């Protein structure tokens, strides 16, 4: 029996302190800690979700937001199928940096039709809020992004956020049903190498991902 139908790489970007790691830990492990330290470098989690009877494995990369790590994290844009931009609704600067920094990085390093999601985190801090939902929705609409407000602390809309981008990716793939590739092999197969569709014996990517202009960076 196949383990999953699709494997997608998603990266989570945004300023340090916006709660990227907390969102990922809440989604992947259902845990939350007030004392979680800022990510140094890059870490990732794997989570399998079921959408419309399709099993999707998400490989989610948690990138460091600090400026000094920007040269490290930029290498992870290539091959990403989806990108989640996170800002803190109580921190206007983190929101401004979405357009001033992070979306510019996406344009520079990611594929042109990568799926994007904007998350306004920390909505549990309503009294300290400085970024309105309307402001964020405007930015999302201008940049062809879905928008969701969430709280890693209270677990509000966290699963919805990640499943939203997973569904968007699945819908992109299934736009080309006649070219849909066969089911992928297990991640535990040591002899395999990673590609956009999962793992394969050779550096050959499926035609559906070529149509989507996705490159894993392994077959160049």
Swiss-Prot record:
- GO molecular function terms here? GTP binding; GTPase activity
Do you know which SMART domains this protein is assigned to? ARF (SM00177), RAB (SM00175), RAN (SM00176), RAS (SM00173), RHO (SM00174)
Instruction: Please provide, in alphabetical order, the Gene Ontology terms of the cellular component aspect for this entry.
Output: plasma membrane
Among the GO biological process terms of this entry, one is:
protein transport
Q: Which residues form a coiled coil?
A: none
The UniProt entry annotates the motif Effector region at: 36-44
SUPFAM superfamilies the record matches: P-loop containing nucleoside triphosphate hydrolases (SSF52540)
What residues does GTP bind to? 14-21, 62-66, 121-124
Q: Where is the lipid attached (S-geranylgeranyl cysteine)?
A: 219
* Keyword Cell cycle attributed: no
**Keywords of this entry:** Cell membrane, GTP-binding, Lipoprotein, Membrane, Nucleotide-binding, Prenylation, Protein transport, Transport
Q: Name one Pfam family in it.
A: Ras
Cellular compartments annotated: Cell membrane
Q: Give membrane topology per the record.
A: Lipid-anchor
Functional summary from the UniProt entry: Protein transport. Probably involved in vesicular traffic from ER to Golgi.
The Swiss-Prot or TrEMBL record describes its family as follows: Belongs to the small GTPase superfamily. Rab family.
This protein's name: Ras-related protein Rab-1
This protein's species is Theileria parva
């Amino acid at each position: 029996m196949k383990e999953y139908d699709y494997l997608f790489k998603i990266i989570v970007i945004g300023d340090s302190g916006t709660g990227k790691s907390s969102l990922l830990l809440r989604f992947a492990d259902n845990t939350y800690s007030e004392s979680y330290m800022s990510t140094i470098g890059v870490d990732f989690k794997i989570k399998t979700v079921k959408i419309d009877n399709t099993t999707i494995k998400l490989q989610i990369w948690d990138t460091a937001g600090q400026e000094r790590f920007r040269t490290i994290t930029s290498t992870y844009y290539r091959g990403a199928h989806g990108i989640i931009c996170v800002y803190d609704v109580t921190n206007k600067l983190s929101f401004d940096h979405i357009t001033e920094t992070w979306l510019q990085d996406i344009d520079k390093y990611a594929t042109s039709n990568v799926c994007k999601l904007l998350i306004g985190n920390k909505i549990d801090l309503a009294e300290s809020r400085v970024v309105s939902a309307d402001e964020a929705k405007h930015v999302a609409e201008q940049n062809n992004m879905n928008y969701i407000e969430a709280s890693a602390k209270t677990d509000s809309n966290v699963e919805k956020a990640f499943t939203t981008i997973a569904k968007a990716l699945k819908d992109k793939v299934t736009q080309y049903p006649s070219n849909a590739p066969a089911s992928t092999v297990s991640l535990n197969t040591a002899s395999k190498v990673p590609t956009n569709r999962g793992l394969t014996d050779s550096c050959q990517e499926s035609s559906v991902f070529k149509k989507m202009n996705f490159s894993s960076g392994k077959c160049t």
